UniProtKB/Swiss-Prot annotation:
InterPro entries: Amidohydro-rel, DHOdimr, Dihydroorotase_CS, Metal_Hydrolase
Keyword Hydrolase applies: yes
Provenance organism: Yersinia pseudotuberculosis serotype O:3 (strain YPIII)
Taxonomy of the source species: Bacteria, Pseudomonadati, Pseudomonadota, Gammaproteobacteria, Enterobacterales
Keywords recorded for this protein, A-Z: Hydrolase, Metal-binding, Pyrimidine biosynthesis, Zinc
GO MF annotation list: dihydroorotase activity; zinc ion binding
Domain of life: Bacteria
Catalytic activity: (S)-dihydroorotate + H2O = N-carbamoyl-L-aspartate + H(+)
Role: Catalyzes the reversible cyclization of carbamoyl aspartate to dihydroorotate.
List of residues binding substrate: 19-21, 45, 140, 223, 255, 267
Protein name: Dihydroorotase
Any one cellular-component term (Gene Ontology): cytosol
Length: 348
């Protein structure tokens, strides 16, 4: 029997999908990311979305001001696509190095997406320009038609929206974000070098039974919602395959405790404090630790055309106890896997 590894050294990872929020929440949650990750693709869905170069620069300044001393962290800013976004603003932001990518939220698909796009073909001129300049398109892949069941919205999005976009703009770099279904995993595997996908720790570790059987667990509620076990297993198989189309994107999305534990709770899982140990645990369960570094630190930079990080992080086989709550002023945030112990810890 092969001895279990006691340490894992990998290049410092990046998080290719995160919500850092703003103000007190930003300063509370950012250190959990900046301590471990070198870079992160920062989502633009603030209450006032990031739609201009000026607002992206201002937000980046606020993020950098919240980075603790001793942490080396680069936020990669994104532009929130709207029905009326000026193509010149998008182009200028990308060419100046302010925008790393642009984010497509179908209107009302998730938190703070009311400003999102209601008529996707109407913004095809933006996609045409993005294809021309090599700017990646990041997609929250769910249809928002009220007649479509919430568990079917990702699969329906592939046929109705994503495939037509890829047919019309074959060299547009697209990240199918936080995929949750076998349909999406198979679609990405069958794609080409212009299509990638991020996968969250919660969608690899849990399915909808974990969220709903024996009581509702609001801290597992996120969008896209957890699916049935067959979809979870397909995601696990996809990342274990070693395919370079899949890369780390936590979709860490904090909300104050009272906004999660309510009669109409918010969607989002705050997984940043345990993200890397959680991914390591999954890859070990799948006998795929040989692919962990590529998933966490190599595939994303390759897709974005960015250099990989020079330094390394070390994971050690030391039990890691996730706190029950994290203080947030007079409130708190409940982290992913609260009160649970993981097998791996990041060496500090």
């Amino acid at each position: 029997m092969t001895a279990q590894p006691q340490t894992l050294k990998i290049r410092r990872p990046d998080d290719w999908h995160i919500h850092l929020r703003d103000d007190e929440m930003l300063s509370t949650v950012l250190p959990y990311t900046s301590e471990v990750f070198a870079r992160a693709i920062v989502m633009p869905n603030l209450a006032q979305p990031i739609t201009t170069v000026a607002s992206a620069i201002a937000y980046r300044v606020r993020i950098l001001a919240a980075v603790p001393v001793g942490h080396k962290f680069t936020p990669l800013m994104t532009c929130y696509l709207t029905n009326s976004l000026d193509v010149k603003e998008l182009t200028t932001g990308f060419e100046q190095g302010v925008f790393t990518a642009a984010k497509l939220y179908p209107a009302n698909a998730t938190t703070n997406s009311t400003h999102g796009v209601s008529d996707i073909p109407a913004i095809y001129p933006l996609f045409e320009q993005m294809q021309k300049i090599g700017m990646p398109l990041l997609i929250h892949g769910e249809v928002t038609d009220a007649a479509v069941d919430i568990f079917d919205r990702e699969a329906r999005f592939i046929d109705q929206i994503l495939e037509p976009i890829r047919q019309k703009f074959p060299e547009l770099k697209i990240v199918f974000e936080h995929i949750t279904t076998k349909d999406a995993a198979d679609y990405v595997l069958a794609g080409n070098r212009f299509l990638g996908a991020t996968v969250t720790p919660q969608h690899l570790m849990f399915n909808r039974n974990h969220m709903l059987v024996g009581g509702i667990r609001p801290h597992l509620f996120c969008l896209p919602i957890l699916k049935r076990s067959t979809h979870q297993q397909a995601l696990r198989a996809a990342v274990a395959s070693g395919s370079d189309r899949f890369f780390l994107g936590t979709d860490s999305a904090p909300h104050a405790k009272h906004r999660k534990e309510s009669s109409c709770g918010c969607a989002g899982v705050f997984n940043a404090p345990a993200a890397l140990p959680a991914y390591a645990s999954v890859f070990e369960e799948l006998n795929a630790l040989q692919h962990l570094e590529a998933f966490c630190a190599l595939n994303g930079p390759r897709f974005y055309g960015l250099p990989v990080n020079d330094d390394v992080v070390e994971l050690v086989r030391t039990p890691f106890l996730q706190p029950e709550e994290i203080p947030l002023g007079n409130e708190s945030v409940i982290p992913f896997l609260a009160g649970q112990t993981l097998n791996w810890s990041v060496k500090r």
